[in-house]
Amino acid sequence: MTEFINRLQKVASNPNAFKKTGRGIERETLRFTPGASLSTKPHPEGVGSALTHKYITTDFAESLLEFITPVSNDVDTVLKQLEDVHHYTVSHMGDEKLWPLSMPCFVTHDDDITLAQYGESNVGKLKTTYREGLKRRYGSVMQVISGVHFNFSFSTEFWDELFGEQSEDQRKESVSDAYFALIRNYYRFGWLIPYFFGASPALCSSFIQGRETSMDFESLGKTYYLPYATSLRLSDLGYTNDAQSNLKISLNSVNEYVDGLNKAIRTPSEEFAKIGLKEGDKHIQLNSNVLQIENELYAPIRPKRVAKSGERPSEALERDGVEYIEVRSLDVNPYSPIGVNEDQVRFLDMFLTWTVLSDSAPMNDSEMACWKDNWNKIIEKGRKPGLELKIGCQGERLTQKAWAERVFEDLLIIAKEMDRVNGDDAYQQTHKRLSAMIDDPELTISGRLLAETKAAGGIGVIGCKLAVEHRETHLAHQYRFYTKQELDTEVERSVQAQKEIEANDKLSFSEYLEEYFSYLK
């Protein structure tokens, strides 16, 4: 019996080990006008304060909405919550629509994009200044790429069965070590996510206007594409940061990770120092270090813990270890009105369970570089028949199909255990549908989207068509989890909460920044 099977049988002996898995979803999407341009309107007043609303906020830009679900133990519940907040928001957007693709179209210049605004409080100004810094460092167009983030945690019962009796400190350390083992395996095998769910094989020419690229694009009118690409969002064209490439933050333990993060937020950048900190009285970045704050660290997956008020993410991890992980490699699913579907959630349930129960040796920088090379191959040509990937750095190779089939043998065992606990066959059905995509790459989201893009004459045409369809779906939606009254109440609460924060400020913004960044001294 393999160690993986042994561990799986241990946790599966307790039905609540799987039933109490925690999941939350964050979905980003741009508002755009009937004339197919980026919205220049403020955040819709009818959905409350972007600073304080629990479920509806903004990301980089005022037009870049972000929908957030609370943590749920039920797959159906988390999707219902997402549907409800989409319906509520679209109902307050007039004739504007939500862009259904990860890569923006019709955006040609940084000046087209208004930074997200959070009011007059110091914390609100901090959020906007941070975004001003991102704009000056990397440009705004790159920052309005949309994605879906999946937050995931194993249950207390899962850890109880896996580790047995432990003291509180032992448990904290074991759980953190297990999550970092998962993260290392995610880098080794997570290329399966863009293979199945990558949804950006093509982009509007406006996105790369004036940008250098070594990619050998084919063109279709104003659309550029790579014939076998899966997720250009995850490529060098998407959200990457050259300044961060030298950070090499260790993923071997929570202490090493926190040390690396602390170093990064304290490392000065000559390049960013040239930007300056102020223009007149206006703050244009929070500081000139490699990372202004820890959230600037780009990663396809992050270890997380809910932070206390005033606590940095790394301080929360240092205090009590890893609580959950945030998967950040999902493109927006253009075929789902909410940007993600049940098969994706169920696949991640199975895959993340497999990554934590499988062996996961420590990883050095050179091994990480080899695994990242596999990701880049899948991102740029993942559907190419016979594409070979490295097995570590040893020179051995395996086709993406053969490797996916091997992983899926283990995932089927997990699917059967999860279905046994739940009394249905939902995970096995997901496994079956995705297995078909291993056999035929054109069934993947990127394969389907590229075929439809070619038939329609461009990616912008597809985006506009799907946006209209999804808007109709959202407007016709009936509440399935929340009530309208509950969401109305949250709007009122958020507006009041922002007013209270603004009224309670005692420091000037400059004083506030000095106090906020006192840890850098």
UniProtKB/Swiss-Prot annotation:
GO terms for molecular function: ATP binding; glutamate-cysteine ligase activity; metal ion binding. It catalyses: L-cysteine + L-glutamate + ATP = gamma-L-glutamyl-L-cysteine + ADP + phosphate + H(+). Gene3D superfamilies: 3.30.590.20. It comes from the Bacteria. InterPro entries: Gln_synth/guanido_kin_cat_dom (IPR014746), Glu_cys_ligase (IPR007370), Glut_cys_ligase (IPR006334). Pathway: Sulfur metabolism; glutathione biosynthesis; glutathione from L-cysteine and L-glutamate: step 1/2. The keyword Ligase applies. It is an enzyme of class 6 (ligase). Its EC number is 6.3.2.2. Keywords: ATP-binding, Glutathione biosynthesis, Ligase, Nucleotide-binding. This is Glutamate--cysteine ligase. It comes from Aliivibrio fischeri (strain MJ11). The lineage of its organism: Bacteria, Pseudomonadati, Pseudomonadota, Gammaproteobacteria, Vibrionales. The gene is gshA.
